[in-house]
Regions:
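Mobile, glycine-rich extracellular loop/lid and propeptide segments
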Residues: 1-4
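Aromatic-lined glycan-binding groove of carbohydrate-active enzymes
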Residues: 35, 55, 105
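Histidine-centered active-site loop/cap adjacent to the catalytic His
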Residues: 79-132
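Stable alpha-helical elements in mature extracytoplasmic
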Residues: 27, 31-35, 49, 108-112, ...
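Sec-exported extracytoplasmic/periplasmic mature domains
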Residues: 36-44, 61-64, 114-122
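Extended non-globular C-terminal regions
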Residues: 138-139
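Mobile gating loops/cap/lid regions near enzyme active sites that modulate substrate access
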Residues: 6, 11-25, 41, 45-102
Length: 140
């Protein structure tokens, strides 16, 4: 389960009246806290919880490290990403992070999915590596 990113760090929040961004940051944080508490209270196991806020903050701070060229201008301009295809996108927007004021682009979704995949697969890689390391240490 992926929680909300910091909505206060979106182009929508940047274009909103003064004071809106901190409020949106607080609201997205409160939602994520309630989501986590609800998940814990449900007693359900086997559900991985991912908080994308640190990832989004890092992408916004260091976009080029992720292949992102722009984190402030939506690929669809002022339009909603709903119904905004390649023909409606602004030129050069394939490396933008936001499709519209709040929604991520295809590139952003790929970055997020890579992050989730690496988080889920890392424990198995460590498990595979540990016996190999023990074996190599034994024979050397």
């Amino acid at each position: 389960m992926i929680a909300l990113p910091d909505i206060g760090a979106t182009p929508f929040a940047a274009a909103a009246p003064a004071g809106t961004a901190p409020l949106l940051t607080a609201l997205s944080g409160a939602y994520n806290t309630a989501l986590q508490q609800g998940l814990s209270a449900s007693g359900t196991s086997g559900i991985a919880y991912f908080d994308p806020r640190p990832l989004f903050a890092d992408i916004i701070a260091r976009p080029s490290a992720y292949g992102v060229s722009n984190t402030t201008i939506p690929a669809c301009g002022a339009a909603s990403s709903l119904g905004c295809g390649p023909a409606q996108q602004i030129p050069g927007s394939s490396t933008h992070f936001f499709a519209d004021g709040v929604h991520p682009t295809a590139l952003a979704h790929r970055i997020i999915s890579d992050w989730v995949y690496s988080s889920l697969s890392a424990p198995s890689r460590v498990f595979i590596f540990s016996p190999l390391l023990a074996f190599l240490t034994t024979i050397s």
